[in-house]
Curated annotation (Swiss-Prot):
InterPro entries per the UniProt record, alphabetical: Endo/exonu/phosph_ase_sf, IP5, IPPc
GO cellular component, as recorded: plasma membrane
Main location class: membrane
Disruption phenotype: Alterations in germination and in dark-growth seedlings. Elevated level of Ins(1,4,5)P3 and InsP2 levels.
Name of the protein described by the UniProt record: Type IV inositol polyphosphate 5-phosphatase 11
Keyword Membrane: yes
Single GO term (MF): phosphatidylinositol-3,5-bisphosphate 5-phosphatase activity
PANTHER family reported in the protein's UniProt record: INOSITOL 5-PHOSPHATASE (PTHR11200), LD06095P (PTHR11200:SF275)
Length: 334
């Protein structure tokens, strides 16, 4: 089996030598199944060998057309125990975001590839000199139409397909149609994006990750009770009203995918520059619009552990909070 990871990866730490994990697909009391999505709790420990692991930090952020270097530094983080860094952006400004991201992620990581569809963007970073491990890299994009192109905030998706150290991965960053009533339209957009950007041959992808502003909202709950529950740290009550999970339960989207528990507060909509929810005349109902989902194609060959799934509340430059996931892969019997 191929050798993955680096000695500084989060799975190379020796603090948790006795931790044992179940392969994805056999999560016991820490998981709940839907027809479309398996919801799993993140674990804070890892027993993967430093010679047989690949750790990936995945970040999605709707930037609302704004950028500051300080926000990007906070986004990337100072602790770099991951191998690959995947950053998906929506409503990215016309400023040279890729250069700022490269500066923020140096000196530990370098840009391996990027994909852009105007304001929908995706960046993939690897450890310095890791480009030698890249056997294939392809960037693709798909537009779902609309007038977003006229105002520089396009809806659609971009993808990076990569073979990194013999692990074939597809990362898709997308921005779907807004507003609570457009559930069916979002479902249709997801199907069109999948048909366009995912390889037909499933053997060409060991790991598939969707990230982005998927724009699914809280269904049939008005603004005041939603905000009251969040204020009292009872946002978990709202999970059953999440449109994305509801559509997954109906079998409409993301069949066979996994997502971390929605333990963090809804990531939209905030007053820019603060952690206060929207007080404008629109007064949007808070929602988990920003999500990260993943799927292992063959769990007999590769196991996955989700180590974190959370929002990054210390970023204030947008009306969305970023979301990050730390995912580690392990070859079975390596």
């Amino acid at each position: 089996m191929p050798t993955m990871g680096n000695k500084n990866s989060m799975c190379g730490l020796k603090r948790f030598p006795n931790y044992k994990k179940s392969p994805i697909g056999s999560f016991a009391k820490n998981s709940s199944s839907h027809d479309g999505i398996k919801t799993i709790e993140a674990v804070n420990s890892c027993s993967f060998s430093r010679k047989a692991d690949l750790c990936i930090r995945i970040i999605t952020w709707n930037m609302n057309g704004n950028v500051s270097y300080e926000d990007l530094v906070e986004l990337v983080g100072k602790e770099r125990k991951f191998d690959l860094l995947v950053v998906g952006l929506q409503e990215a400004p016309k400023a040279n975001v890729d250069q700022l991201l490269q500066t923020a992620s140096s000196p530990t990581h370098e840009l391996l590839g990027k994909a852009k569809l105007q304001s929908v963007q995706l960046y993939l970073f690897g450890p310095k000199n890791s480009h030698t491990l890249v056997k294939e890299l392809k960037a693709e994009r798909y537009s779902v139409g609309g007038c977003g192109g006229l105002i520089g905030r396009k809806k659609g998706a971009v993808a990076i397909r990569i073979n990194y150290d013999d692990i074939k991965m597809v990362f898709i960053s997308c921005h779907l149609s807004a507003h609570a009533k457009k559930v069916d339209q979002r479902n249709t957009e997801l199907r069109h994006i999948a048909n366009s950007l995912l390889p037909r041959d499933k053997r060409k992808r060991d790991l598939t990750v969707w990230l982005g502003d998927l724009n699914y909202r809280i269904q049939d709950v008005s603004n005041h009770p939603v905000r009251s529950l969040i204020q009292n740290h009872l946002q978990s009550v709202l999970v059953s009203k999440d449109q994305l999970l509801q559509e997954a339960e109906r079998g409409e989207i993301f069949k066979g995918y996994s997502e971390g528990t929605l333990g963090f507060k809804p990531t939209y909509k905030y007053n820019v520059g603060s952690s206060d929810y929207d007080t404008s005349h629109k007064i949007r109902v808070p929602a988990w619009t920003d999500r990260i989902l993943f799927k292992i194609q063959d769990t007999d060959n590769i196991q996955a552990t989700l180590h974190s799934y959370d929002s990054i509340d210390q970023v204030y430059g947008s009306d969305h909070k970023p979301v990050k996931a730390d995912l580690c892969l392990k070859w079975v019997n390596s």
